[in-house]
Amino acid sequence: LRDWQRAGVWDQLHRAVLDRLGQAGVLDWSRAAVDSVSVRAKRRGEATGPSPTDRGKRGSKYHVLCDRNGLPLHALVTGANTHDSRMLEELLDTNPGVREQRGRPGRPRRRPVKLHADKGYDYPRCRRYLHERGIGVRIARRGIEDSQRLGRVRWVVERTMAWLLTFRRLALRYERSRTSIEAMLRLACALICLRRLSRLP
């Protein structure tokens, strides 16, 4: 599993399925969403840290970017003590993108038209980053705006998190190696997308 992750096999699988979905017109880039979920780690290991929401117990956090339909476009692993806002740039910058035109040259699509996020991303740095890249900003404002008002779009990423946690090895982390947990996360994203691809006529 780790060797294939180092060789990029799981990333390539995920990208191949996303390309097929993109070419079929299934991916919806009009509104994307980002969020994260924390899980406990049974052992000390790479990309773990004390969770501020779980009495300081050691854990990891999965950061996910999904399209309007909740299909995972990209995902990263960090320690549970990593603030969501710190991962926004890396999540978007390292997204390999999707080739939506089969057999035609051109850059893969990486950026949504608009991005939805909760108050954990309400920082000038995050808003500036999105504005500079021409991405519409829909981030709940701390102390002003109720995050539930954005729920009609953001609920899809919550559902995506629930899908990911149906994979037992992601719901509770056992592996010490960052490479191993990243492999499982990439494979889970690929399988979620493959389920959608299998329903195409």
Task: Locate predicted features.
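Short alpha-helical elements
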Residues: 1-201
